[in-house]
């Protein structure tokens, strides 16, 4: 084998910066969450703030996130909120970086596809540059979308995917694939400590009400008394993970020894018609279910193989769909001003 083809072992991780050692040498763990004002990010903040030795810094541009998700922590001495776009460098001192920043809903990433891919590529480069400078460990929330419209079911981490590189979803799908590449290149070339989570469909309180994702769509429609709009043919499947389970998986990955990628998701699989019927039964039995045209490149099936998460992280989801939907319904009722009869 030619020398240029040989596998190169990763360099040892860089030492923390002199500034980190001199100014912040203390027992507290300083943790940055990019996109921390968003749905999953804000729940991650809540969990990390339970540990009194954690100082949590959130950087968010509020494109899809909201200060309301973090209002309980604003003014807390161990919490800091920075209005910042990750496509610009960020100069702070931290020990860990959870890199969540990126629009994850088709409505948002199709609205500004160039911004979406810049966030995935330039934003990830900036977060990796920060990790390199300060010697921080960095976790990327990648996505099940890297598998595209999968030809293998369920999807293990070893599957390379079936992605359309020029479709309307490509800014997100391919952007996350590039972000994963950058993570491993920085790991191999610079010794950065990396973790990659491939997260599957997640639901729960604080989801954007009109973000175009199927669970939030159905619950909002049911509460408004509107027909549930199921994209044809309705037999396409998804797997839904409750947000508390997702946060638990991300934290276990960050604190563990495996770089990933590791699938984090609930392997319970439902067709879109089954999901609509469940939401109808639980929230508003009087509404109709209406079939509408599908969007291009919509995957026919999606289900995580979580064997690796079980073996490496000791993680598997606990909350069943019928347990999680009422918790999300309660949050949506409050925000929509719809009272139970």
Curated annotation (Swiss-Prot):
<dbReference type="GO" id="GO:0070403">
    <property type="term" value="F:NAD+ binding"/>
</dbReference>
<dbReference type="Pfam" id="PF16363">
    <property type="entry name" value="GDP_Man_Dehyd"/>
</dbReference>
<dbReference type="GO" id="GO:0042732">
    <property type="term" value="P:D-xylose metabolic process"/>
</dbReference>
<feature type="active site" description="Proton acceptor">
    <location>
        <position position="172"/>
    </location>
</feature>
<feature type="binding site">
    <location>
        <begin position="231"/>
        <end position="238"/>
    </location>
    <ligand>
        <name>substrate</name>
    </ligand>
</feature>
<feature type="binding site">
    <location>
        <position position="213"/>
    </location>
    <ligand>
        <name>NAD(+)</name>
    </ligand>
</feature>
<comment type="function">
    <text>Catalyzes the NAD-dependent decarboxylation of UDP-glucuronic acid to UDP-xylose. Necessary for the biosynthesis of the core tetrasaccharide in glycosaminoglycan biosynthesis.</text>
</comment>
<feature type="region of interest" description="Disordered">
    <location>
        <begin position="1"/>
        <end position="21"/>
    </location>
</feature>
<dbReference type="GO" id="GO:0005737">
    <property type="term" value="C:cytoplasm"/>
</dbReference>
<keyword id="KW-0520">NAD</keyword>
<dbReference type="InterPro" id="IPR044516">
    <property type="entry name" value="UXS-like"/>
</dbReference>
<feature type="binding site">
    <location>
        <begin position="172"/>
        <end position="176"/>
    </location>
    <ligand>
        <name>NAD(+)</name>
    </ligand>
</feature>
<dbReference type="GO" id="GO:0045492">
    <property type="term" value="P:xylan biosynthetic process"/>
</dbReference>
<comment type="similarity">
    <text>Belongs to the NAD(P)-dependent epimerase/dehydratase family. UDP-glucuronic acid decarboxylase subfamily.</text>
</comment>
<feature type="binding site">
    <location>
        <begin position="214"/>
        <end position="218"/>
    </location>
    <ligand>
        <name>substrate</name>
    </ligand>
</feature>
<keyword id="KW-0963">Cytoplasm</keyword>
<dbReference type="GO" id="GO:0033320">
    <property type="term" value="P:UDP-D-xylose biosynthetic process"/>
</dbReference>
<dbReference type="GO" id="GO:0009507">
    <property type="term" value="C:chloroplast"/>
</dbReference>
<feature type="binding site">
    <location>
        <begin position="298"/>
        <end position="302"/>
    </location>
    <ligand>
        <name>substrate</name>
    </ligand>
</feature>
<feature type="binding site">
    <location>
        <position position="201"/>
    </location>
    <ligand>
        <name>substrate</name>
    </ligand>
</feature>
<keyword id="KW-0456">Lyase</keyword>
<feature type="binding site">
    <location>
        <position position="169"/>
    </location>
    <ligand>
        <name>substrate</name>
    </ligand>
</feature>
<dbReference type="GO" id="GO:0048040">
    <property type="term" value="F:UDP-glucuronate decarboxylase activity"/>
</dbReference>
<dbReference type="InterPro" id="IPR016040">
    <property type="entry name" value="NAD(P)-bd_dom"/>
</dbReference>
<keyword id="KW-0210">Decarboxylase</keyword>
<dbReference type="GO" id="GO:0005829">
    <property type="term" value="C:cytosol"/>
</dbReference>
<feature type="binding site">
    <location>
        <begin position="60"/>
        <end position="85"/>
    </location>
    <ligand>
        <name>NAD(+)</name>
    </ligand>
</feature>
<protein>
    <recommendedName>
        <fullName>UDP-glucuronic acid decarboxylase 5</fullName>
        <ecNumber>4.1.1.35</ecNumber>
    </recommendedName>
</protein>
<comment type="pathway">
    <text>Nucleotide-sugar biosynthesis; UDP-alpha-D-xylose biosynthesis; UDP-alpha-D-xylose from UDP-alpha-D-glucuronate: step 1/1.</text>
</comment>
<dbReference type="InterPro" id="IPR036291">
    <property type="entry name" value="NAD(P)-bd_dom_sf"/>
</dbReference>
């Amino acid at each position: 084998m030619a020398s240029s083809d040989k596998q190169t072992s990763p360099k040892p991780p860089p030492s923390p910066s002199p500034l980190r050692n001199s100014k912040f040498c203390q027992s507290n763990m300083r943790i940055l969450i990019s996109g921390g004002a968003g749905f999953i990010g804000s729940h991650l903040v809540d969990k990390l703030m339970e540990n009194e030795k954690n100082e949590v810094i959130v950087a968010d541009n509020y494109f899809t996130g909201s200060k309301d998700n973090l209002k309980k922590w604003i003014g807390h001495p161990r919490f800091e909120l920075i209005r910042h776009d990750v496509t610009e460098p960020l100069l702070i001192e931290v020990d860990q970086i959870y890199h969540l920043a990126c629009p994850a809903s088709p409505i948002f990433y199709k609205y500004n596809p160039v911004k979406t891919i810049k966030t995935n590529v330039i934003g990830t480069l900036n977060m990796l540059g920060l990790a390199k400078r300060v010697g921080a460990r960095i976790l990327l929330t990648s996505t099940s979308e890297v598998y595209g419209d999968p030809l293998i079911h369920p999807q293990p981490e070893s599957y390379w995917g079936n992605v359309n590189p020029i479709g309307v979803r490509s800014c997100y799908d391919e952007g996350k694939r590039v972000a994963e590449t950058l993570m491993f290149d920085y790991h191999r070339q610079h010794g950065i400590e990396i973790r990659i989570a491939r997260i599957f469909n997640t639901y729960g309180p604080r989801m954007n009400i009109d973000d175009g994702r199927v669970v939030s769509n159905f619950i909002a429609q049911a509460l408004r008394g509107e027909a549930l709009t199921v994209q044809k043919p309705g037999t396409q499947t998804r797997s839904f993970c409750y947000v508390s389970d997702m946060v638990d998986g991300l934290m276990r990955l960050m604190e563990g020894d495996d770089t990933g990628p590791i699938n984090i998701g609930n392997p319970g699989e439902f067709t879109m018609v089954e999901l609509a019927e469940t939401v109808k039964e639980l929230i508003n039995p009087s509404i109709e279910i209406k079939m509408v045209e599908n969007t291009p490149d919509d995957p026919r099936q999606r289900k995580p193989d979580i064997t690796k998460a079980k073996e490496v992280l000791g993680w598997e989801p606990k909350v069943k769909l019928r347990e999680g939907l009422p918790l999300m319904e309660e949050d949506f009722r409050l925000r929509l001003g719809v009272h139970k009869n």
